[in-house]
């Protein structure tokens, strides 16, 4: 089993067949809808809120609303659908969440997407929730995770998941690997590679994305969609407190299993950090799309599929070559 991560890999260019990168198509079909980019903001409180969810849906980007305002989920679905927008929500696996799914069916409030969102998704509780959703609201596109093994992907798919989310603790504000000794931190791209070979349905790569080039690498190794946390945090539109430190503006960014999200110091597997303010989210999305178009042109194609076929080399932590401060 080859073990590598994002910084260990460079993709090998092919002959370019376009006159301009603007000819390259970054759209992706994911479930019942098509989206401008194969990228989704992490369903975290410091990355996604209702205002941003609305903006993403209006502009043909995929989003997943976090699950930390449980009472607000049904009103959120109704509001989005009244505006002619798709609804994409998260659920956990506690007993009350099974009742919540039944209430969606009873009230005929059916979101287009539901993400079952727990840290260790290869579990009986997630399998039971997948089956529960498919029994009561079978038309919903169900994303389940997170897993880090081919066995996990297969079991969730066999239970009825329409997509699986791969990544155990590789994110910047996740400390699972330190607290538990388990995870895909440091070999997330390799884990994605192995999981995608077992998958029959789409995979979301979740965690460890530090640069726009990592998005192209995720697609090369089997992702249909790439979940991004820290790169989407700390924008003008982002949730979270803004602070000034040494004359620079920063925004808070914390993990979904941190004490700042939980409100208590118990079973903590996340931390809080401050990320330098990045300006407009629209500008970041535009740059992300342009960089991905460039990636497609280097791959020798016109769409995302060309990225899946390119060769790669393993270069062991040398891609930055002194060009980038790795503390960023």
UniProtKB/Swiss-Prot annotation:
Keyword Signal: no
Active-site residue list: 174 (thioimidate intermediate)
Reaction equations catalysed: IMP + NH4(+) + NADP(+) = GMP + NADPH + 2 H(+)
SMART domains, A to Z: IMPDH (SM01240)
Record protein name field: GMP reductase
Pfam families (alphabetical): IMPDH (PF00478)
Gene Ontology cellular-component annotations: cytosol; GMP reductase complex
Organism: Staphylococcus saprophyticus subsp. saprophyticus (strain ATCC 15305 / DSM 20229 / NCIMB 8711 / NCTC 7292 / S-41)
NCBIfam families: GMP_reduct_2, PRK05458.1
Keyword Protein biosynthesis: no
Function noted in UniProt: Catalyzes the irreversible NADPH-dependent deamination of GMP to IMP. It functions in the conversion of nucleobase, nucleoside and nucleotide derivatives of G to A nucleotides, and in maintaining the intracellular balance of A and G nucleotides.
GO MF annotation, one: GMP reductase activity
EC nos: 1.7.1.7
Source superkingdom: Bacteria
GO biological process, any: purine nucleotide metabolic process
UniProt keywords, alphabetically: NADP, Oxidoreductase
Gene: guaC
Positions contributing to NADP(+) binding: 203-226
């Amino acid at each position: 089993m080859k073990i590598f991560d994002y910084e260990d890999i460079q993709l090998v260019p092919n002959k370019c067949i376009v006159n301009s990168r603007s000819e390259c198509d970054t759209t992706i079909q994911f479930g019942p809808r098509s989206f401008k980019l194969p990228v989704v903001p992490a369903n975290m409180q410091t990355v996604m809120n209702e205002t941003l969810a609305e903006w993403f849906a209006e502009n043909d980007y995929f989003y997943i609303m976090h699950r930390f305002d449980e009472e607000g989920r049904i009103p959120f679905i109704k509001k989005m659908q009244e505006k002619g927008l798709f609804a994409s929500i998260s659920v956990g696996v506690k007993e009350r969440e099974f009742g919540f799914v039944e209430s969606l069916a009873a009230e005929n409030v059916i979101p287009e997407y539901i993400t079952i969102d727990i840290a260790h998704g290869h579990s009986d509780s997630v399998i039971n929730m997948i089956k529960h959703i498919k029994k009561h609201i079978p038309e919903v596109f169900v994303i389940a995770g997170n897993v880090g093994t081919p066995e996990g992907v297969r079991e969730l798919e066999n239970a009825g998941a329409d997509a699986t989310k791969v990544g155990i603790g590789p994110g910047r504000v996740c400390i699972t690997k330190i607290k538990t000794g388990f995870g895909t931190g440091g070999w997330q791209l390799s884990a994605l590679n192995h999981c995608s070979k077992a998958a029959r349905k789409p995979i979301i790569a979740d965690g460890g994305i530090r640069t726009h080039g990592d998005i192209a690498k995720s697609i090369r190794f089997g992702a249909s969609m790439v979940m991004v946390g820290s790169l989407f945090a700390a924008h003008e539109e982002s949730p979270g407190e803004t602070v000034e430190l040494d004359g620079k503006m920063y925004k808070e960014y914390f993990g979904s299993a941190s004490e700042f999200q939980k409100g208590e110091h118990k079973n903590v597997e996340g931390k809080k950090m401050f990320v330098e303010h990045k300006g407009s989210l629209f500008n970041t999305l535009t740059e992300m799309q342009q960089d991905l178009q460039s990636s497609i042109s280097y791959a020798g194609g016109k769409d995302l599929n060309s990225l899946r076929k390119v060769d790669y080399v393993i270069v062991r932590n040398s891609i930055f070559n002194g060009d980038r401060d790795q503390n960023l």
